[in-house]
């Protein structure tokens, strides 16, 4: 099962997103949205291995506790109980944000950009907050922010780095052997469970990787 999750595309996505775009350095602050999810939880743990201060964004108190207690995040924000995300990020990241691993897009991305440091890096890995929108949402224009702070914001599709899958998987396995990485999975049985499992992903009901056994 690990090869369907942390040693598969899930872990490889987190690893290569940080390695190729985020390039976190010791002492920097890494912010991760969708932090309790399969990719986000691994990204946060890799950030800790790299010596970063890691802050996660998730959507329930249970998830907030999980990413701090199980995955070692330094701080966490529950976006569902936060009225002002920009302020919440500023408080959780008093030294600003150097790397933002974005799995959700939308208003949370806007709030993160407002807290980015000079030469910050944004990894646009997902936009789950927008996938079910019938109309394209509007938001702040980001050009001035990107220019003023020399921020790199890059869309990321793991398929662009197929040649790097082997080395990434090898490094992830080495960290697992040293107990530096943990993971969770939600396993449901039966082909007929696939539609509900897919819906549960968008409702955030899964813990880590969603796996359907048929």
What is the role of each PLM region?
Residues 1-214:
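Terminal helix/beta-alpha structural elements that buttress the NAD(P)+-binding lobe
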